[in-house]
Amino acid sequence: MGVESVRCPLHFTKMQGAGNDFVVLDLRDGTPPPDVALVAWLADRHFGIGCDQVIAIEPPRGVGVFAAYRIWNADGSAAQQCGNGARCVAAWLVRDGSVADEHFLIDSPVQAHLVRCIGKDEYAVEMGLPVFEPERIPLSGFPNACGEYVLSLQGEVLRCGAVSMGNPHAVVEVDLIDVAPVERIGSLLQQHVAFPESVNVGFVQVIDPGLVRLRVYERGAGETLACGSGACAAAVVLMQRGRVGRDVRVVLPGGTLRVQWPVSGGPVTLSGPAKCVFDGVWYG
């Protein structure tokens, strides 16, 4: 389904979770997924609809799962994980009438997620286990996991944490989040040889053991108003260091998320808003 071949009009829903916005397509009827060109076209904020990512809802792939979904970044590249997107998929399914239960399963490209409705336009999603082993993030040049990695970045020494939440994340702790060099360091880290699949880069400031501020420079999208998997990544890295507790609020430019990781070796839970902005028709 490309720009030239897509059948117009194309119905869609615009959704957002803490300002991280999505164009959601219902492809449960077997319609082919969008190609790179169409995703980039839909995501364009001037000539298309405009979003950080495009989500396609597809038929379930497993037993007990209500729906599956795929995610693409604004540049058309595929994404493996998106916590805000998962909540928006859940909200879309509830609004559509596809699910009536307070607890249900949805399939992302990397795993099934248990979702709970916890209030009006509020959802909690199990994000799975954080992965700290370098080869599984992937992070090259470091045989063993550690709390902090030291990288050379154009003559600078940069210290960061690294973790996979189904997608790779680097976490840089800063003193003042408002003046952090998010775009410069973020783009350099995404091109660094240590991250062969590129990386989402989070810049985090600890306010107190239960509260942090975060900005995220995402693969294929640049800085976004919020990043759910990035919030989880920053929180678990800080938890591993003993910098915050096991239940932390993460304040991003677009809103506040809650990350809970009760025990190491257990799943991480991400909670926050997910709302429909509008339904629309795209005419190409």
Curated annotation (Swiss-Prot):
Residues that hold substrate according to the record: 20, 53, 73, 83-84, 167, 200, 218-219, 228-229
MF GO annotations: diaminopimelate epimerase activity
Site (Important for dimerization): 278
Residues flagged as site, Could be important to modulate the pK values of the two catalytic cysteine residues: 169, 218
InterPro entries attached to this UniProt entry: DAP_epimerase_AS, DAP_epimerase_DapF
EC number: 5.1.1.7
Domain of life: Bacteria
Biological processes per GO annotation: lysine biosynthetic process via diaminopimelate
Recorded catalytic activity of this chain's protein: (2S,6S)-2,6-diaminopimelate = meso-2,6-diaminopimelate
UniProtKB keywords: Amino-acid biosynthesis, Cytoplasm, Isomerase, Lysine biosynthesis
Database matches in NCBIfam families: DapF
Subunit structure: Homodimer.
Official protein name in the record: Diaminopimelate epimerase
